[in-house]
Amino acid sequence: MILTKAQYEEIAQCLVSVPPTRQSLRKLKQRFPSQSQATLLSIFSQEYQKHIKRTHAKHHTPEAIESYYQRYLNGVGKNGAAPVLLELANEVDYAPSLMARIILERFLQGHEQTPPSKSVINSMLRDPSQIPDGVLANQVYQCIVNDCCYGPLVDCIKHAIGYEHEVLLRDLLLKKNLSFLDEDQLRAKGYDKTPDFILQVPVAVEGHIIHWIESKASFGDECSHHAYLHGQFWSYWNRFGPGLVIYWYGFIQELDCNRERGILLKASFPTDIVTLCHSTA
């Protein structure tokens, strides 16, 4: 789904004052019925992540951490089965999984002789049964499963969706009988930064020569696209020539402004691929 900047900003504006919950996503779908659920979810997640980055620091001051921890202790002291940590995260407008990390780190600091390592924290968040306190383990679990934008569960889902779309792209290339090298093959050849697929024989799409294709299972907004441009796409262009980026969940139309410089954006696999023998694949 390709949106104009105005259409995107209308959706983003609706997300300013809503909590990152599945109920909010359902309301967003009702407000914009013509947009796909996947596109709205991607925008929803990206906008919330921007908000979290802007407000992250205030939640990590020593005063804030101690305040949250004492509120957690008071809450579970009254009712350990209540979703104390989840409700605290929602109240202070912070991602539940990130709030769980704050409280878990603070708990371990008070119960362990040495500060917990990042790997230990991550392992406990992935598997709360490792947490040496049953009440806290349950509280952390509630945060993880109810967070639709952050946390190990969301990370696993995003990884699976990204892989699924890479497999889809591979299948479409094979169906079109287009020869390619994938990321693993390219790294085996010594390349450190590579697109998902390099075409062994270039093709043309909408009059533009394409040497490589990158799959992005997300919506291409201004922030993420500019980060990808400078972190990935221009590097690919510099090494392999012009290429194509597929944002499977759509992008802002105005961002497709580098076609003449060698980076083409699409929201789906192109249907008008022209091979060197001048036939449509």
From Swiss-Prot:
* Keywords for the protein's UniProt record, in alphabetical order: Cytoplasm, Nucleus, Phosphoprotein
Which GO BP terms apply?
erythrocyte differentiation
Its annotated compartments are: Nucleus; Cytoplasm
Which residues are recorded with the post-translational modification Phosphothreonine? 114
Q: Under the cellular component aspect of Gene Ontology, which terms does the record hold? A: cytoplasm; nucleus
Q: One Pfam family, short name please?
A: TPD
Q: Tell me where it mainly resides.
A: nucleus
Cystine bridges: none
The job of this chain, per UniProt, is described as:
Plays a role in erythroid cell differentiation.
Q: What is this protein called?
A: CDAN1-interacting nuclease 1
Q: Which organism is it from?
A: Mus musculus (Mouse)
